[in-house]
UniProtKB/Swiss-Prot annotation:
The keyword Mitochondrion does not apply. Part of the gene cluster that mediates the biosynthesis of elsinochromes, pigments consisting of at least four interconvertible tautomers (A, B, C and D) that have a core phenolic quinone to which various side chains are attached and which play an important role in fungal pathogenesis. The non-reducing polyketide synthase PKS1 was proposed to iteratively catalyze decarboxylation between acetyl-CoA and malonyl-CoA subunits for polyketide chain elongation. The lineage of its organism: Eukaryota, Fungi, Dikarya, Ascomycota, Pezizomycotina. The chain crosses the membrane at residues 96-116, 160-180, 183-203, 220-240. It is a multi-pass membrane protein. Disulfide bonds: none annotated. The gene is HP1. GO terms for cellular component: membrane. It comes from Elsinoe fawcettii. InterPro entries: Elsinochrome_Biosynth-Asso. It is found in: Membrane. This is Elsinochromes biosynthesis cluster protein HP1. The keyword Glycoprotein applies.
Amino acid sequence: MTTTLYRDYGRPEYTPSVQTFRRTNLQVTYNETWTQPTTLAVSTSTTTITAGAFETRWVDVSIVESVNIVIGAAPNCDGYFIGGKNVEPNPDISGIGVLAAFLVSAWVVWATVLYAFARGQADAEQVKASDVRFFRARGGDRQRAGKFRRAILVLSDQQLVTGIAILAAAFANLDGISVYHYTFAVRLAWLSSSVHLSTLLLLRRYLREHRRYLWFRVGGMTLLFVMLMISLLPTYMYAFQEINEDTTSYINLRPANGIPAGCFWRVLASWRPPIDVVKASYSPGYWYFRSGKVGVDGQSIISAFIPAFTF
């Protein structure tokens, strides 16, 4: 069964694409302004939508094998927003090797910094009274501190470069990575940024004495910070539709983490999200992604902006 839907985002005619649903007892929600009279026929039900009218429809679908819905969008972002998409493996971002490389290097850096403080390898001026009282830290001379400085310098640069690299890879392939892998890359970049900042505890005097290295790192830190801020821009779309009073009419368990991250950037760039997206950002209830599903919840607005709180 094929149903053609027409949507008006104020842009040229789209190239139709196909979304296939393979779920039973699926409920599909349509909430759009239609550009022409459209007859929506799914299973045994038929609904006529008037041209130019803003309509909200909940269509119960009983599927034996599959239902194909041809939607006017390219790529299939509208179809994904309606039917969702399961996450597909992406070892280049979330593979064991990538994760191990980030975590092991982070643990090594943290262990090295803590050891330097505990064993007196840090500059004496960096050890405060609270460090001595609570962590039994000891200050050392410059000669002893220099033994760790070269190793920490290399590890610090590694964290800065890997954080920038993984975000650059995510930005370069937005249509090829899912929401799950996009947020995974952003979190790894945040980890790299935090670990890099921890190394500066032992490098303060060195960077103060070597200005050219200082400005190189300031430039890298600024670039990573800007990239991290930009990476958060589309996350408000996690609250892309306001909750209706009749929350039982919405899809409760729709796979969502597999939707391409580029879909959210595309809506953000066009600045034509559903009219109620602004209301959704400030309402007590909204759509959100959690554990690979789309659901309804009345949690804090912070979850709409910070990915770490939405899974």
